[in-house]
Amino acid sequence: MRVLVAMSGGVDSSVAAARMVDAGHDVVGVHLALSSAPGTLRTGSRGCCSKEDASDARRVADILGIPFYVWDFADRFKDDVIDDFVESYARGETPNPCVRCNERIKFSALAARALALGFDAVATGHYARLSDGRLRRAVDADKDQSYVLGVLTAEQLRHALFPIGDTPKPQIRAEAAERGLAVAEKPDSHDICFIPTGDTKAFLGARIGVRPGAVVDGSGTVLAEHDGVHGFTIGQRKGLGIAGPGADGRPRYVTAIDAETGTVRVGPAEDLEVWELTGERPVFTSGVEPGGPIECQVQVRAHGGITDTVAELRDGKLELSLRAPLRGVAPGQTMVLYRPDPDGDEVIASATITRR
């Protein structure tokens, strides 16, 4: 099988490539250049798409004896990920750019080019598992990335490979060291790759500008002024510009955002609780829509935010009734549905949260 491996220059994708070679596949490595200004994006302690990352990936490819290329996806990444991120925050939403990148770049634009060039599959260093076409959680629960892959369609998954999903991260690093790969101890990435300073508010402010509004309490009393709703997200407690807790002495959190009026509402923690969720643009991993209610679990962020639920497709949207409340759920987040399974919880659907 001809396999294209997306190589970031990190340890995970490097071991993924090595395992594809071990399996006897015809392997080619490709590094995605996602920025027209290398160094303005980052992974770990260095820049994503930086010369260092590309060089690390190339050195691994040389050790493995596979061809290696750098493909420029900077324009597509800007349009489909960065601009989408900025526009979502301007609407008062909280998007996950990693979800969007997987959906529109790695398993869409990249996969389409790979298939057009005669490759059978695209392999990545994601921590997730595929068995019989079913997407499951990784063995390493702390590193599991099935959530950010939950938006993939059955057709996209048919051409995807996740070679490291059955192995804990410490063993991946040990394997890289045994193979003599210099990236064995390279730091993991944790922040948004296209915000090198880590200051999301400043990044958004530079692109959205000043859009004044008010911070109000549950009664509508104005507590403070702000420069734009892009500086807030549901569940936020710090940086609200207000004079401490409420009259009852309890902390206050962002509980609602109205981008049209520029209003940010704050309230006590219990105001964050939701028992129902609605999601648009649902994707069913099997490619088949359910015929009735589904007993499952829902996850609303990359790590944590999981509860039992009953999901039902109504008028093209997923309607969820939660068995226990979730807190800090924001429009724009992705909700991923799982079917519990002793062999690894299976992803069955996803959607973008529109109402909480």
UniProtKB/Swiss-Prot annotation:
Localisation per UniProt entry: Cytoplasm
Catalytic activity: S-sulfanyl-L-cysteinyl-[protein] + uridine(34) in tRNA + AH2 + ATP = 2-thiouridine(34) in tRNA + L-cysteinyl-[protein] + A + AMP + diphosphate + H(+)
EC number: 2.8.1.13
UniProt-annotated site: Interaction with tRNA, residues: H126, Q333
CDD domains registered for this protein in UniProt: MnmA_TRMU-like (cd01998)
SUPFAM superfamilies: Adenine nucleotide alpha hydrolases-like
Function: Catalyzes the 2-thiolation of uridine at the wobble position (U34) of tRNA, leading to the formation of s(2)U34.
Family, per entry: Belongs to the MnmA/TRMU family.
Name the UniProt record assigns to this protein: tRNA-specific 2-thiouridylase MnmA
